[in-house]
């Protein structure tokens, strides 16, 4: 009760008494009313976040974490016998993460046998997102006062990317909150020196443990603690020298205890408390799975993005008011020089991870969600910058004018929320123009929130027709796990099916839900997307982030099935019918073109089939100018038509559009071989090897080329093994490289009798 009374006195009684006495300032010159304003703002942010998140969909990665949570729980249930949660694979790096929030909520879900469990996951995410807002605000208050705390709270709530991910991203948002919580307690712990408050030490320990129990990158908080403690000790060495060893022991104890706590929630770490944690830390930014995404109007691989990808995305998607405040904080560093240590802490924690990701060329995707943990620090700096400007202005009316300018800059994200809820995170600022201006240039709903609204529309509006092949309406979707969840209570009427956008004509479905994410930007930019059989669109700022398609014909699927049955004539007939309905039908156009190109290998049919293939491909490419398979097939046509230069040019275009497209390199090498350019063919195949697309066909072709170049068997193998040795060294596979080093020595020994 005493604590509650002190709280009420500090935040309400004292400010309101001061207002009544017309004395609204503390001895530091801050208006006391900022205290109750902060309480109102922080409470509003919690309930506002929970209210807005009710309409959120399932995030793109959510089910992977659901499945891993079950593996983690099984690991503990079986006493470690079930090691699925502790065994990383090439396609599953989740054992590198502890993901404690996921595990915690699924323990509750299992305990109460909750069927509709996604809202509970999202509620936990909301609360943890709000925790980040709270601790960022408290950090700002510690440095700049309660007005800075209010600014931080408001700016984080009005940050569309942060708020939108707080709806359902139970990995990046809890990690961001745990990190800012750790930073806050690091500052508080150091501030308290030479005294050591046990409550602060305990909270710092729990914060670091919490961060590391979500993602191994939480160990960065240990490094932060050590770095900032050393700097603070040097700064305050006269005061702190007598308590150096005491402080050192406490600091080590905090870090060791945090490490032990996080290990208990992390199966992979339990299997190897030192080696596995080190392995996870060194591999956390080296995702083995690269994905393609739209950036700067091109489809690009996530492991080959420009160095400025993350910084640019941050600049494009952060509200101008935050960027302005951040800039002001740098401008006013001299003015705030007495607080240099605190500014250094916040600035370093905001910028260092971004710089490291750029330097390390990390494999990142999905905008900058992997860097969300830096954002609370950025916003704290922004709030301090805005606060400093107001502190410097002495004229009351000038303060009002600046405050009004701040409010006007907040209108843009607020209006975005109103127009585009629940897709708050699909946001681009005025540097880009608007979300509409970014359409076709950058990914929109990359976390697939819009699937929920699309599924709801299908459930309410879908009807059987003459094309329906069974008792149920088949709903196709690339993201099958969320689709299954959305339709789990309607299985009497609906059946879900997995279908990729590029293969939508290859299977049976009646309706398809398609997220615009992953659609080739050339198709978007030339206006052929959405296709004409679109019956519903989910839009953000007037552009579709997801669509619902209704099947108009199934000739393409039937033709595809005929080809699988090797009934070429029937396939040709069915593909032609599909094209009569939809001239740019992907399955039909490319399927029929492939048939014609195959038939053109027969001399008697070449003159008839090649022009037909070219016409089909030209029509399709006009609608889909950067379609890799279509352009690759057109390059085949050119090579068959003895237009080698055009074939090579088109192969280069395909490689530019997708540097991992194996067929383009192989076809270009074939073209070079046909012209007798052995070195040119070798160059294409070496480039292919360096993309990581190693195959038996590539190795055999290289060996053949080396022999054509005049090398005997032994030297051809030595040259091949040397290439493979260099490749494996380049990607860090020292063991594989050593095997080829040994193979070279064996060949040389056999050839020349070397000992």
What are these regions (language model features)?
Residues 3, 435-755:
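C-terminal luminal/periplasmic domains and tails of membrane-associated envelope-modifying transferases
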Residues 27-32, 193, 236-252, 328-348, ...:
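Membrane-interface helix-loop-helix junctions at transmembrane boundaries of multi-pass membrane enzymes
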Residues 38-40, 136-158, 177, 195-199, ...:
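Transmembrane-helix signature of polytopic, membrane-embedded enzymes
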Residues 39-43, 223-230, 251-256, 334, ...:
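Signature aromatic-anchored transmembrane alpha helix within multi-pass, membrane-resident enzymes
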Residues 123-143, 181, 185:
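Transmembrane-helix motifs of polytopic, lipid-linked glycan transferases
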Residues 136, 312-340, 388, 497-499:
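Hydrophobic, aromatic-rich transmembrane alpha-helices
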Residues 182-200:
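Membrane-interface transmembrane helices that cradle and orient dolichyl/undecaprenyl
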Residues 252-286, 408-424, 684:
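Membrane-lumen/periplasm interface segments of specific transmembrane helices
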